[in-house]
């Protein structure tokens, strides 16, 4: 009986292995190839979406292909892109930062108030502002890493605290563009325009592109970048491999704060004036998360790239500009972006499910 039972179990096991082999072979067809490609290169989806959008909007309005149109899109998404870079490195660690917009606006207020209220040279107030932004990011990181509080709750709280401090400290006063140009022109440096052929480009666009290139290199080609991915993918395994998770998290949130400070400096150049009530304090959070999600970075951490975020930010700019040139209602932009967000998260879930 034991022999017959063993033969029966061996037969079932053999058939199961054949079935699994057939199933795996089937999965490695077209669907399997798509899954493997997207898992390895998550920015492919936003790249395809952007190319299709450019083709469609170009067919609707040939002026969309003008070089000047691209330069305008880059100027529009520059600030969001820098905030998106800050958001991306946090989300790669399986966190989220809801305070990026508030830190950016408060940085502009600090630079403005130190220049006009205390009479400190603009070059020094810029350093003070970015350092303050880094400190705000450090506080987020310390609360998340050392006290092990949920990133969502921590940054939701600091978002409110920073926004309130922003209005209290500034007394809700706006510093006019002409006053900044006359007395603290260095604050508007990134708004300087130069021409490349027919395109009008600001230094702020260059700052955005350089920061994206630097962070893309750091995350893909340095040990620190690999540690960021490791902490987001599997923090326990990362610690077993010798990665100091707490230190990496604090560094990530601090760097995110510094990037928000740089975004604040660029924003002064883009808009000219300094206003504590700037809408970016609220919208910056949503826009940065949108660029990250559409760009293929997983909200669960450990997967994605800065290049994907860059493409996600461009997609938002392309849709806004394309629909505006087509004469469509602005609400269509929000509708289509919402669809893209849901589609991006759905694709991410599919990739994670199949990979599991």
Residue ranges and their predicted role:
Residues 60-72, 167-173, 218-225, 249, ...:
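Inter-helical junctions in multi-pass inner-membrane proteins, predominant
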Residues 120-129, 135-140, 144, 197-275:
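Helix-loop-helix "hairpin" substructures at the membrane interface of multi-pass membrane proteins
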Residues 14, 254, 260, 271-338:
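Transmembrane alpha-helical segments in multi-pass inner-membrane proteins
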Residues 2-53, 240-247, 270, 319-356:
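Cytosolic-side transmembrane-helix boundaries in multi-pass membrane proteins
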């Amino acid at each position: 009986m034991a022999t017959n039972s063993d033969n029966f179990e061996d037969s079932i096991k053999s058939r199961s292995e054949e079935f699994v082999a057939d199933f795996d072979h089937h999965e490695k067809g077209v669907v399997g190839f798509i899954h493997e490609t997207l898992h390895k290169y998550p920015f492919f989806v936003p790249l395809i979406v952007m190319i299709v959008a450019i083709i469609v909007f170009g067919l609707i309005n040939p002026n969309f292909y003008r070089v000047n149109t691209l330069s305008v899109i880059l100027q529009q998404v520059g600030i969001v892109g820098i905030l998106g870079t800050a958001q991306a490195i946090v989300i790669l660690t399986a966190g989220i930062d809801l305070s990026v917009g508030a830190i950016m606006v408060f940085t502009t207020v600090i630079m403005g108030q130190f220049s006009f209220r205390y009479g400190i040279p603009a070059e020094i107030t810029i350093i003070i502002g970015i350092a303050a932004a880094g400190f705000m990011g450090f506080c987020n990181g310390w609360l998340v890493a050392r006290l092990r509080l949920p990133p969502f709750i921590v940054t939701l709280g600091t978002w409110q605290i920073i926004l309130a401090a922003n209005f209290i400290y500034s007394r809700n006063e706006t510093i006019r563009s002409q006053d900044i140009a006359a007395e603290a022109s260095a604050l508007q440096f990134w708004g300087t325009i130069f021409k490349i052929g027919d395109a009008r480009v600001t230094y702020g666009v260059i700052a955005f592109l350089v920061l994206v290139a630097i962070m893309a290199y750091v995350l893909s080609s340095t040990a620190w970048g690999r540690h960021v991915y490791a902490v987001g993918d599997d923090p326990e395994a990362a610690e077993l491999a010798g990665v100091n998770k707490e230190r990496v998290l604090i560094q990530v949130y601090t760097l995110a704060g510094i990037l928000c400070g740089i975004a604040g400096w660029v924003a002064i150049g883009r808009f000219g004036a300094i206003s504590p009530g700037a809408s970016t304090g609220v919208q910056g959070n949503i826009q940065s998360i949108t660029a990250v999600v559409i760009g293929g970075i997983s909200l669960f951490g450990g997967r994605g790239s800065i290049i994907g975020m860059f493409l996600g930010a461009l997609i938002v700019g392309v849709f806004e500009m394309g629909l505006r040139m087509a004469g469509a209602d602005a609400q269509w932009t929000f509708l289509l972006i919402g669809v893209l967000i849901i589609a991006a998260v759905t694709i991410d879930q599919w990739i994670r499910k199949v990979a599991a």
